[in-house]
């Protein structure tokens, strides 16, 4: 025991090193000293064994705890540490990754990929455009989706109807073959997908002419979707099972429909509220007026009070967008913009001049306040 180096020193890590730090150090050293990288180098081989021994202990929480308490004696199967010391068996969870690097595939059977079983079909993404009103109140839409369908001729088998499907004699129907490799540490078995049957375990002697042996065909299918009221631009509707069919009995993929909403010439959307800008004349603003205001439900009458200022906003309760998941609707906000005429006839100009002479500043509170502040600022 006295000749053994400290395991943490062997791996070049601190005693408080995390599992990830241990694994990283181990991988780097194992690659550095691996016998296949250093053929005939007995020093490198000894280092490699030392690194594996250190990692075998420190990667196991119970063994590491005994080592931290009792040192090498705690890992000696003949000492008071009990069973669990170093043996020639490697920790497959760690060294298996190293052998993948040098030999490819999976050197240990327990980590090999199994033959492919049922697989979910591919998901399909689709985009459709709807109007502002359709987004507000919902709509049923029929879309044409390009998707894979099970071949009706061979019912998905890929074989010509009436032909024979034989078991692959390369893998005996397992879909996998094993390759034995001799290494300085013994014989390792690498499991890989059978090239002859591509992992299917069967050989189709006469492929289906309709689908070229694939068992599926691409086609365009009409699908009806219900777009709910209140949906917003950029939101997605999912239809479970609306995607491509599964493989080997697996479930169908899903269909995801992205909704794009066309801009409206009058309305803009803010959450579940609708904003509309309405132009009025300066006489309507000054005297007040009954206006026809467009809403999603049609035109409604609304009276703006006298003295309305440009930029004033009025609320029409419950005239907005329906809530997507719940009752009720948002509101509509009407923003008033006062339009000043660009052309006036002589009579109109004369009347306005007369109005200006008799109005004074008392009827223009904002203007009067502004000039009062300006006088104070430049005293």
UniProtKB/Swiss-Prot annotation:
> Which cofactors are reported in the record for this sequence?
Zn(2+)
ZnF (CR-type) residues: 138-220
What's a GO biological-process term for it? Answer: chaperone cofactor-dependent protein refolding
Q: Which InterPro entries match?
A: DnaJ, DnaJ_C, DnaJ_domain, DnaJ_domain_CS, HSP40/DnaJ_pept-bd, HSP_DnaJ_Cys-rich_dom, HSP_DnaJ_Cys-rich_dom_sf, J_dom_sf
Boundaries of every J domain copy = 6-71
Task: Please describe what this protein does.
Answer: Participates actively in the response to hyperosmotic and heat shock by preventing the aggregation of stress-denatured proteins and by disaggregating proteins, also in an autonomous, DnaK-independent fashion. Unfolded proteins bind initially to DnaJ; upon interaction with the DnaJ-bound protein, DnaK hydrolyzes its bound ATP, resulting in the formation of a stable complex. GrpE releases ADP from DnaK; ATP binding to DnaK triggers the release of the substrate protein, thus completing the reaction cycle.
Lineage, top ranks: Bacteria, Bacillati, Bacillota, Clostridia, Eubacteriales
Which protein, by its recorded name, is this? Chaperone protein DnaJ
Residue stretches of each CXXCXGXG motif repeat: 151-158, 168-175, 194-201, 208-215
Cited NCBIfam families? DnaJ_bact (TIGR02349), PRK10767.1 (NF008035), PRK14277.1 (NF010870)
One molecular function GO term is: zinc ion binding
Report the family membership: Belongs to the DnaJ family.
- The answer on whether this UniProt entry bears the keyword Chaperone reads yes
User: Which residues are involved in binding Zn(2+) 2?
Assistant: 168, 171, 194, 197
SMART domains found in the cross-reference section: DnaJ (SM00271)
Location in the cell: Cytoplasm
| Free-text comment on this protein's domains from its UniProt entry | The J domain is necessary and sufficient to stimulate DnaK ATPase activity. Zinc center 1 plays an important role in the autonomous, DnaK-independent chaperone activity of DnaJ. Zinc center 2 is essential for interaction with DnaK and for DnaJ activity.
Comment on bound cofactor: Binds 2 Zn(2+) ions per monomer.
UniProt keyword list: Chaperone, Cytoplasm, DNA replication, Metal-binding, Repeat, Stress response, Zinc, Zinc-finger
